[in-house]
Amino acid sequence: TTKLLSTLKEDEYILDVVGPLGIPTPIEKFGRVVCIGGGVGTAEVYPIAKALKEAGNEVIGIVGARSKDLVILENEMSAACDKLYITTDDGSYGRKGFVSDQLLDLIKSGNKIDVVYAIGPIPMMKVCGSVTKPFGIKTYVSLNPIMVDGTGMCGGCRVTVGGKMKFACVDGPEFDAHQVDFDELIMRNRTYVDLEKTSLRKLEAHICNLSEKKLAGEVVK
């Protein structure tokens, strides 16, 4: 679906959009809050950081990416946060390492952190939760498991939180990181990996075929 969206041209549009889904993100005056965005998760954590700042919090941001060219929304996050840290896996920009490394340093610095929001790849969110748990810091993660209808009917987005089954589309997307069964979530998200790869190959071949027809001046339907 992401690949299909990227093929849309000017004046083309999505017929219908359903939303917002789930439960609103908890926004209140907590005190000192750390907002962490990993990869494209930065796009989701940015409005949260902005809202938390407007609610009167001291907001510390951490943005992580594999390399400098993949860092996004740096200026926007900088404007929304009192302090912003950048980390890259390869050290090409900011601190070399992971967002969890920076998070642990902030915790160990002695300045009290009241709440953490971590959004990004599942392994990243799992590690951030593991970092904050020994210190008893409330940590929210935003889960985006396999989702079909978005109303809780299909059960595709079910996750185990605190030993109970939840649906990310209606009960989430934010959950307590210390209660999420991340191992189960990772396993479920791999269910359709092979089918997704096959589908992507077919789609790319189809797009390539259409492009060749256009270049040849054929009518494309």
Task: Tell what function each PLM region has.
Residues 13, 32, 54-61, 83, ...:
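Residues at the starts of beta-strands that form the adenosine-phosphate
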Residues 21, 40, 66-67, 123:
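Short, glycine/serine-rich, charged loops/turns that create anion-binding
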Residues 42-48, 124-127:
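Short glycine/serine/threonine-rich phosphate/pyrophosphate-binding segments
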